[in-house]
Curated annotation (Swiss-Prot):
The lineage of its organism: Bacteria, Pseudomonadati, Chlamydiota, Chlamydiia, Chlamydiales. The modification N5-methylglutamine is found at Q251. This is Peptide chain release factor 2. GO terms for molecular function: translation release factor activity, codon specific. NCBIfam families: prfB.
Amino acid sequence: MHENFDKRLELLLEGLALTRRSLFDPEGKENELKELEQQAVQDGFWDDVVRAGKISERIARLKQQLSEFNELKNKVSAIQFFLEDEESSKDLEMQKELEKEFVFCEKKITEWETLRLLSGELDRNSCFLSINAGAGGTESCDWVEMLLRMYMRWASSHSWRIEVIDRLDGEVAGIKHITLKLVGEYAYGYAKAESGVHRLVRISPFDSNAKRHTSFASVEVFPEIDDKIEVEIRPGDIRIDTYRSSGAGGQHVNVTDSAVRITHFPTGIVVSCQNERSQIQNREACMNMLRARIYQKLLQERLEKQNIDRKNKKEISWGSQIRNYVFQPYTLVKDVRTGYEVGNIQAMMDGELLDAFIKAYLVDYGEIT
């Protein structure tokens, strides 16, 4: 037992040193935090509400990251001190507590090692994530709602802010379409691995004959981009429609045509937003999404061109089936791109195992995304 702990401690110390040296840079983050906090107390800081909001979010994120790093560093030091104390290290109750500390530290190191795989130009950005029901009717709409729950729990575990941008409920149950905005560092870097078709196999609760059904839902992920990235959208290339926002009812459902849908003719891209209170705000949000979708399409075309010359490397097939979720006759979740699989489907649907699938994807595909 003691030898096992010693080996695990050695790996933790190596991981902590590598994280500090090549990724985290706590000194740099502390300096950035001081500079931003100085800006935040200057007169007129809130004159530009958008800029001030972004700086405030960055300050909160830096504080959280530094807190997490210091917590990890302190826990590793405590483990090291414990193992050097021969009397304490023989105590069985203390060993149980030590195991919990090891699991916590190892999980955190693994999370930060995953960040080292996120080197794309937009990986640090927030993102939009859309889920659309495919073939399967009500069953597929229910599948969208199940995936939504999984992604919301997963995003919450990363401390990202979740905004519902657009939603269309199913006629009987579930959701036909939903778009989320995940706000936080590396949201796009992680979530981009989820783009593609997700296949569900289960005995449908909507079938009185209890037959097994196969349903599909597609997931699209595209990064939020700032004004520094130029995307040309000519007025004559778009059509703007307004409509009454939908919802489950109650005081927050608009009674005016405040929801906005924009169609971009050259690409066929359609975006919509009903989250904001006014038509002007929804229109602005739609334009931001449209810019992001068009830019993502340009990136995809560039990657597809690069894939022509990658005969010895795996290709990225946009919109293809990426993962199977089998509930009956056995339980299995398998990624068809990487071969990574787990049998605990409930933990997967609770968002607890998604990071492992994403890391496997990034290891195999990270350099070409």
